Amino acid sequence: MDLATTNDAAGAGNDFDTARITGDIDALAAKHAGHEDVFRAAVSRLLKAELAKVRDAAQAKLLRDRHGRRCAERLCFIQDEIIRLSFSAATRHLYHSPIPSDGERMAVVATGGYGRGLMAPESDIDLLFILPYKQTAWGEQVAEAILYCLWDMGLNVGHATRSVNESIRQARRDMTVRTGILETRFLAGDRALYDELVTRFDTEVVQGTAAEFVTAKLAEREERHRRAGQSRYLVEPNVKDGKGGLRDLHTLFWIAKYVYRVHESRELLGCGVFDVREYRTFRRCADFLWSVRCNLHFATGRAEERLSFDLQREIAVRLGYTSHPGMQDVERFMKHYFLTAKDVGDLTAILCAKLEDQQAKPAPVLGRMMSRRRPGTELRRVPEGDDFIIDNNRINLAAPDVFKRDPVNLIRVFRLAQKNNLAFHPDALRTVTRSRRLINAQLRENPEANRLFMEILTSNDAETVLRRMNETGVLGHFIRAFGKIVSMMQFNMYHHYTVDEHLLRCIGILQDIERGGNDELALASELMRKIHPEHRPVIYITTLLHDIAKGRPEDHSIAGARVARRLCPRLGFNASDTELIAWLIEQHLTMSKVAQSRDLSDRKTIENFAAVVQSVEQMKLLTILTTADIRGVGPGVWNGWKAQLLRTLYYETEPVLTGGFSEVNRVQRIAEAQAEFRAAFTEWSEPELNAYIARHYPAYWLKVDLAHKIRHARFLRASEQGGRKLNINVGFDEARGVTELTIFAADHPWLLSIIAGACASAGANIVDAQIYTTTDGQALDTIAISREYDRDEDEGRRAARIGEIIEQVIDGRLRLPDVVARRAAGKTRLRPFVVEPKVIVNNQWSDRHTVIEVSGLDRPGLLFQLTAAISKLNLNIASAHVATFGERARDVFYVTDLLGARITAPTRQAAIKRALIHLLANGGAAEQSVG
């Protein structure tokens, strides 16, 4: 146990009267003498009731004082007393031995997390029963009595029963056992047995094995991070096992305890691992993370370790966070969480660096932790940097005052490390972090500092260097607007990372685009080679700044453009380029929205987009930025379909901007797409290919990616050979976490609504849809639904159910409203979110159709309800464009009235808006006549 914290735990004794409870147990023993089972049950009930009372008191104190570590200590102290009381009941009343033999000895020991002296409300209890070499039945009986008492109380108990010899033997060969014994505390019984274990463990296991232990623990840490998600900035973090969580702090202390033989966290100061400021950070991080974890357990009544969206707001309220303009209470809480996770990562890096200097572990593992370590111990000046030296292939300071003498060195050190491919010496990093407050207005306006920063941003490995600048606080101090979004989380299900992490990842993706070679990024890579050379810095700074104004009350695109207009002149951009950067930031969501939510075969869509982008060069830059932005949102967000939509929008717009000239005109692009299909799909004869190609309209060839075209061809052939009216093909996209249903059937005015209703009735949530009609009147619709099951077989069965429902509705055997109503009660996962319903009815987006854009909180059955409501309003849906962005649905419908005309009457437009907003706001299924 970390003895530095035990004083607070003792206060828990005010809530738990051990002496009184001991008397109560004695009274129960007298009352139930000769009835052991009745006595055991009575003791369990008594202790369970006492535990419930003190746990309630601990929760009340936590809500008042918000000290998580104290709460964990109180809970651990209470659990210790419970175990001591159960041991006493077993040895005094059940298996009393007045004159115990050598074999009738036992030490009850806390191990693992419980042995640390800290315990969350629903944590497992790990116990080790140490028995003598020569054992009797007594030891097994006592251990069983204790365990059954705890299990009857509903506690989760892990246990092992071993002799000292067995413990030492297992600790030598099993790192988990070794770590458990490292974190032991004596609870009850024979102290001499415990002392023997501790002494022998120290001399026979620990001595001489520090390098082995550290290597194993860091390997475990890497694997744990891989399982939990590598980034510490994932927006639903695991408080216990995630990167920057409690387990990282524990690993840090285990290593220090093993290597430096410390027993209390304050000893980390004495052995030089941390200075006073770092030790305070260690304690502050632990207290905050324990507050979060204890509140999670109390709020859920289970060992919940993941801060999922549906819990984040409740925990924020429990911890006392309030909303501020531009930031919700939950976003302020999560920003604090991610800043804490960052601090934990910094502390781990400091310890690993100290171990490296002392050569306490092998170089290969260390190399993964500290990056790019190579042999050699020579000290020499860094080229072009007299204030810095190369120390074992790491950049270090030539003198302790290099930053004070010349604050530009705070930027220069990162550029020199980047230019010379050097890692950072831990002493240099520490000094940089402590010197960041030297970055003042004068340094921010310094031309040399700004030139160096732009070199960092536009040179190789920019993401890594910027990340290191961010971790030390230099980036946020040098660009103050960036400092405001560090560790900022957006409370939605679309963005996977914090804002700063997203921006840094986008820079890495931009460099991938520039390098080329990735087929998914082919268009952006092609355009990157063709932009004007002077615009290369423009696209880099735009990518870094495009979300810089998140968390402000106003639209972040407009506010971000203002930030760029203030910032970019100091970075060396002229007025024209500054305005271009501001325009790109202001429009950075436009291309994605048009590509995914508009009919790209509608001439008006292209003309409107051309009016926004104004020139081919600006469209090139916007395409590159849009690609990096979508790809940087998180795994599975970017896909071939979105890439194809952007490509189509780009090449459809190019001739409008050039007065008819396009590097690749529309007819040529259709021909190229068809030729690509012919070359890749060699299963059919030339006449068969010609007939199949003629079945699809031009929009199909421009919008659908090659993999889906091939899949569609095989599916249509198999469908027609099978002779069924309705055919469904099922595909699985693991990267996106969706199941794709491709439906081939005779076109039907209600088909989209029927498909949407069938998905809703099966509990399937539609995340996007691609809807096409063939030249011979068949519908070919691909619907992506959120994956519900881990096994493809289970997903396949759900898809089959959806197909059966569609068939039954088309045949008139089933009414959809009845089955949809039963399933559309709402998704628990979406309940924490609030999305304001919004409906736009617009005649400027198309010359042939009225466009209805609907956005609101996604829910099961929403698309069905919308299509049914639109049909009930006597409107025909010509095309639909379905997309979800986490919890937000944005569905766009191109409609006409029943005579094929646009909706021009203001009163009718207003009625459409009212009906759809009412549907979005109230969550009720619209009545309609399907089925």
Swiss-Prot record:
EC number: 2.7.7.59, 3.1.4.-
Keyword Metal-binding annotated: no
Domain ACT: from-to ranges: 740-822, 851-931
Recorded catalytic activity of this chain's protein: [protein-PII]-L-tyrosine + UTP = [protein-PII]-uridylyl-L-tyrosine + diphosphate; [protein-PII]-uridylyl-L-tyrosine + H2O = [protein-PII]-L-tyrosine + UMP + H(+)
Domain HD: 499-622
Domain of life the protein comes from: Bacteria
Cofactor(s) listed in the protein's UniProt record: Mg(2+)
Annotated spans, Uridylyltransferase: 1-383
Pfam families, per the entry: ACT, GlnD_UR_UTase, HD, NTP_transf_2
GO MF terms, alphabetically ordered: [protein-PII] uridylyltransferase activity; phosphoric diester hydrolase activity
Keyword terms: Hydrolase, Magnesium, Multifunctional enzyme, Nucleotidyltransferase, Repeat, Transferase
Annotated region (Uridylyl-removing), positions in chain: 384-739
GO terms under biological process: regulation of nitrogen utilization
Purpose: Modifies, by uridylylation and deuridylylation, the PII regulatory proteins (GlnB and homologs), in response to the nitrogen status of the cell that GlnD senses through the glutamine level. Under low glutamine levels, catalyzes the conversion of the PII proteins and UTP to PII-UMP and PPi, while under higher glutamine levels, GlnD hydrolyzes PII-UMP to PII and UMP (deuridylylation). Thus, controls uridylylation state and activity of the PII proteins, and plays an important role in the regulation of nitrogen assimilation and metabolism.
HAMAP family to which the protein is assigned, alphabetical: PII_uridylyl_transf (MF_00277)
UniProt-listed NCBIfam families: PRK05092.1, UTase_glnD
Name of the protein in its database record: Bifunctional uridylyltransferase/uridylyl-removing enzyme
Organism whose genome encodes this protein: Nitrobacter hamburgensis (strain DSM 10229 / NCIMB 13809 / X14)
